[in-house]
């Protein structure tokens, strides 16, 4: 199934998806300065900017949906997309919309998860890939990878270790999504094995 990838910034997760050879039909950035657009262009992938500034949420999401429909996208990967999507968008892709989060959910949802982990003194952190639902980082968990929190870690060091696992895990989950292997029964996701 064709994937659409939504991005906001650097695009390192997008690059991991590109390097994995996934069927990406279009990359959409909500910021024209997003470096991810150059990564898409270099890979020969269609890419567009749909800015959110000055638009109501539903109007912005309608523009996203129009671009995704034009490219026949069947599933969506949020790869560093820094906007919260409403039910209006989410309901178009039931169990076909995934996100990554830099914590072992349900711990530390929302912004600054890495800083929250350090502030709480946890010994393990990590990355979660989950289905997006109507809650903030609360959708059914597809896969997780843990990393140790080392003495002396700061946000940068811990986030770099998490990011390495994210770049490994996200393409594997996205491939399972694209091939239709994932199934969700309540909060239990089946069909993914590393």
Regions found by a protein language model. Name each.
Residues 1-194:
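One-carbon transfer enzymes
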